[in-house]
Regions:
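Extracellular loop and loop/strand-boundary signature of outer-membrane beta-barrel proteins
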Residues: 40-43, 78-84, 101, 139-145, ...
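Outer-membrane beta-barrel proteins
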Residues: 45-47, 78-81, 122-129, 180-184, ...
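Short glycine/proline- and aromatic-enriched beta-strand/turn motifs that initiate or cap beta-hairpins
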Residues: 20-60, 70, 209-220
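Predominantly the C-terminal beta-signal and adjacent terminal strand-loop region
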Residues: 162-220
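Gram-negative (and chloroplast) outer-membrane scaffold detector with strong preference
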Residues: 65, 70-135, 207-214
Length: 220
């Protein structure tokens, strides 16, 4: 997994460097984009056990590449008849988006592509109640709060389209692979903020964004 992480980070750096040095032609105004996810708040209306708030900031390098930083917060509650689990924390993803549409089609307004991300989650997990039954009866206990850091990589295909001038909507599918859970192989967190199910190596997800675009340089 460490080799995979090193390779993934190298790929992101190479992609950014290549984009920064290859801007021979720009057919539209490069933009800074600020976005807020609405899927998390809407999902919270239906399920009060999961609150997810996140957004992203992206900066165009050229007509088909953009650097992206995503940040967010998540609070998760899980209850069963014999235990309760709580997890909350902040997460960040860094990476690059690649627009597969040609500049004449995208015009800085449309996106259909894929992103590469490296994610970090700093979270606090605890089990305030735990009950175990054995031959002599039931035993209750708890696991105190513990702060951990998890690492993961991600592919994020998605689409975006402009509704009004400099205002867009779009969705992103999250295909995540856990590199390090932060808790060791024998004790896994049920839910990792920004990643998902901490007991699985692969965790999918989805976001739906409202995006505000700000042109920052005139087209050549």
């Amino acid at each position: 997994m460490k080799r995979i992480s090193a390779y993934f980070i190298s790929l992101l750096i190479f992609s950014c460097f290549g984009a920064a040095t290859g801007q021979d032609t720009i057919s539209y105004n490069p933009k800074i984009r600020v976005a807020a996810d609405i899927f998390g708040p809407v999902y919270y209306i239906a399920d009060k056990n999961l609150l997810s708030l996140e957004g992203f900031l992206s900066v165009d390098f050229d007509t088909n590449k953009a650097a992206v930083i995503e940040i967010g917060y998540l609070d998760y509650i899980y209850s069963q008849y014999n235990y309760d689990f709580l997890s909350s924390g902040y997460f960040m993803r860094l990476g690059v988006d690649f627009n597969t549409l040609n500049p004449g089609t995208s015009q800085g307004k449309y996106y259909a592509g894929i992103g590469l991300r490296y994610g970090l989650s700093i979270f606090r997990a605890e089990t305030p109640f735990l009950e175990h039954e054995n031959y002599w009866g039931s035993v209750t206990g708890f696991a105190p709060p513990e702060t951990s850091a998890a690492h993961f990589i991600e592919l994020s295909p998605g689409i975006r389209t402009e509704l009004f001038r400099n205002v867009s909507i779009g969705w992103t599918i999250r295909l995540r692979i856990l590199v390090y859970s932060g808790t060791g192989k024998d004790l896994k967190s049920i839910y990792i903020p920004g990643y998902g199910n901490g007991t699985k190596v692969f965790s999918p997800g989805i976001n739906y964004y409202i995006i505000w675009s700000i042109p920052y340089r005139k087209a050549k």
